Amino acid sequence: MNLEEFVHLHVHSDYSIVDGLSKPEDLIKKSVNLGMKALSITDFNNLYGAIKFYNAAHKWGLKPIIGVTVKFFSELIKNELTELTLLATNQDGYKNLILLISRAYKKGYFCEKYVTIEKKWLSELNNGLILLSGGCQGEIGKTLLRGQTSLISDCLHFYEKYFSGFYYLELIRTYRENEEKYLSLAVDLSYSQNIPVVATNDVCFLNKEDFKIHKIRIAINEGVRLKESKIQNNYSKHQFLKTEKEMCFLFSDIPEAIINSVEISKRCNVFIKSGQYFLPQFNTRKISIENYLIQKSNKGLKKRLESNFKKVDKEIFLKYKNRLDTELGIINKMGFPSYFLIVMEFIQWAKDNNIPVGPGRGSGAGSLVAYVLNITEVDPLFFDLLFERFLNPERISLPDFDIDFCMEKRDRVIEHVVHTYGRESVAQIITFGTMTAKAVIRDVGRVLGYPYGFINNLSKLVPLDPGITLKDAFSKNSELYTLYKSDEDIQNLIDVSKKLEGVNRNVGKHAGGVVISPSKITDFCPVYCDEKGNNPVTQFDKNDIEYVGLLKFDFLGLRTLTIINCAVNMINKNLLLSNKKTININSIPLNESKCFLLLKKCETTGIFQLESYGMKDLVKRLQPDCFEDIIALIALFRPGPLQSGMVDNFINRKHGYEEISYPDHKWQHILLKPVLESTYGIILYQEQVMQIAQILAGYTLGKADILRRAMSKKNIKDMAEQRSIFIEGAQKNGINRKLAIKIFDLLEKFAGYGFNKSHSVAYALVSYQTLWLKAHYPSEFMASAMTSDIDNTDKIVMLVNESIQMGIKIIPPNINLSKYEFYVDHTKNIVYGLGAVKGIGRNPILNLVQEREKNGLFSDLFDLCMRTDPNKITRKVLEKLIMSGSCDCFNKNRNYLLSLIEDAIKASKEHFKIKKFQQESLFGSFKEELNILKKNNNLLNSFSDEEKKLENEHKVLGLYLTGHPIDRYAEELKYYLNNSTFSKLKLFNHTKKKIMVAGIVVSIKTKVTKNKNRIVILILDDSTGLLEVVIFKRLLNISEKLIQLNKILIVSGFLNTNFISKNLKMTAYDIMNLNLAREKYLDKLTIVLTEKQRDKCFLKKIYQFFQNQTTGIVPVYIFCKKKDLDSEYKLIKKWLITISNKLLVELDIFSKENKMQIKYF
């Protein structure tokens, strides 16, 4: 035996989530570089990284040893938590590891952040496992350190009984507390009881210098600063992946511990099968699964053809039948008939149970079999879609249907699958959250104690690009790189962040991925559950699940399907009441001019995929007039086409500004016209790349899909091979070599931008359905859209504003009219949903609505409180209802209602108390007290109350519904602004033209520019719309005091377009509040009197009123109306006043009391 050989048997990767720092492949690479022959992975309580570790080890020529470190409570030492490391020696051992870990999660045995097993489970799942005792943290270790020698024999008896020859005393020498003491006692026990020992290093990080990074990672997980972390004391700087030589030297006094590490590695031989796929058997009774699929498909084809065509002639039938037979042949040959039938079954169940299902998504929409089985609603032949893009018979590929369900009912479908195939056979798929560039800077900065502002400003310099790394951030933001080079603190923070970037931080659940196993999931992979043992999730991610032979089914939630379903139900309910024919959203014509007129006008708010500002700009330029254009829109609106110039070419060709060629005016071929005609000669879709290869170069569609993939991946070797095949095939078809080369070059260029047409068609269909609903049933559609986003105030505000612009009346929230959701009344008005009122919640509202529907309308606040449970309808709920205007139906001032809450709640509690104890004798006196309370006088609804009322309304609704603060000043503002409301700004030719606007400030954000200058971004609301206003340093320095929430500002500046949103914004040149504007622009204040009011008594009242006003510069005039001649008089000079809000309030009251008119200019 070579005493310099050693194998690490206790190693934690970053899949231990907290306890390990290194990626499995990094551990393997270092091991190979150090000349090691084998390595283990023993993550804490999981096998998350087992497959990745296994595959990487084989890739690098290293023997993988699969294990896990577990915890359990030892009954021998007063139920204290202890550790064990388990290693699989064979397939049985690997299976038992899976069962042990899965059982721990299913039973929900959690202690702090760790899941635990029960020791007794080891007695039944012992086959194929080697146990390492756990060192100081093990059951034996803790017993030895406490000197409880009497318990040792009982402890060892268990391991001798069930793991004789497979149990090792683990020796760890990382210089932590008690390790040497334990080591000495363990070696003595080894000699006296003839138990073998083995050396490990309890590896947690790759290199010695990573210890600091490891401690920071632990502190991040704890949520404390580095110096406050306590758990880090459990670790040592020596827990890195040491060389064999270092380990042999470390245990030179106990050579058998080194030798046994190698011996154990030789005993561990796990082989994980791959390349075979396992699906549950679909019940076809006596028919073979293949023939059953053929029968179902042919029946489905007959129904589809009869539905789609008035007359099915022989040519049409053969076209579809030949395609169907081809697909069925491929599906059955590749062994996937069960997959299609399983998907067919749960989709049909969903439809039968009124759960909306999307028309398709991804390449699955290219399958005719899927269409005739009602898996999709897209006819692939009509839209020229390719099956081979979905399932390629010429390469190893798996079917993968992405299925959209109604967001609210998706879980019902998953529960149906669980019921059908068994709870033990169905699980969702795990995902791993990693430390991302922005987040890791914040986390590391916080742990190292840097100030919040410093961390925040630094993290903001990382671009928002999805998946961006810190390395990429340097190249994209030169300021970040400059700061890194010049500032030591920033350099330190980023250097640490780089080492933690990408490290696994937490586990999550795939958005829709579900696996269905032919037997128990644990026959293939371990499962993870929540702390109650529910909601099983595979411990392998989607790639590793596929490796072990399980196929993924995607159950995705799509909010738009919920909107469509809600709208259609509302529409059909009203149609049935009117004895009219109901609508079927899947049967609407795809060429209605009314829809395309709405689209061309860019009125796409609420329309699926088409409502962003950027998309609206593209719609405006393209002016789509057919369904194919909508398909193209979805494919064009991506960074590649937008940045490449492809979009401009497409638009210019559509409008005749550029010649249509197939595909290029210099290099084209007439054979490509049928393929490219619908996209004006532009290669837009991946399917077009495949068809061009088929037509020009004789590729099969399977081989054309391989070409497409090679072009997308830009693999130089593969591309060189494909180039030769393409040119040779084209020449065989009589195509000029030079032309073949040029067209291949064009294919290569556009393939990188090409989009999956099958996906684009399916989503274009959903887009069109929402467009059709908005065009034909706007109220129902908008109400449904609002309900679907009822918790998203910003979206509600946008949809309400859009509805008002469409001419739809919005009925404000009303406790006697509204429901939780938005709905449409018999006059096509939208009734505001109480669920959109901030801070109330679903249950209180449902409680109120249920009571109202059962026992009638509420007469007043007291009635409301006494008919509802005071524990559910709390003070907070009542305040929000009143502030939102939901109680305006009681015809009382909101301030008054707010003042009654205390009495109303008191009365309610007294009422329920009397009711509970059935003290009927008390009801008489209670009613008398209640009547006294109700006789309180109403408060005056003054102007200041109105302002507060609207401010509160905006606070709980996010918008103004019953009025607008700016309405009070509408006439006055016209004098300053020349009627330039936000809704009219789009009519301006706003280049180089300064204009003036006014609005109430509803949002204030501050940003710091690259030059360290502060800018402020305001959102102004003028009741007709919103406008973004940017204020730079110069103006900010002199006007910052004027900028306050809920205050009116008058802003002059220059309009331009936001580059990202394509929305209008203003760069401010000057800012005024109302007082400053009045000083600058108001000429006079005029009091208009009738002829009867020209008596001395009335003039004296006016005189007395103005005597108390502040002097200023605005003169006061009296305008007298006469039958024959009107006249105007200027008052004495001392009546020069300052127009303030206070004056306007008092004037408002004074003028109403005296029935006269006031004019401000």
Swiss-Prot record:
Belongs to the DNA polymerase type-C family. DnaE subfamily. DNA polymerase III is a complex, multichain enzyme responsible for most of the replicative synthesis in bacteria. This DNA polymerase also exhibits 3' to 5' exonuclease activity. The alpha chain is the DNA polymerase. GO terms for cellular component: cytoplasm. One of its GO terms (biological process) is DNA replication. It catalyses: DNA(n) + a 2'-deoxyribonucleoside 5'-triphosphate = DNA(n+1) + diphosphate. This is DNA polymerase III subunit alpha. It is found in: Cytoplasm. Keywords: Cytoplasm, DNA replication, DNA-directed DNA polymerase, Nucleotidyltransferase, Transferase. The gene is dnaE.
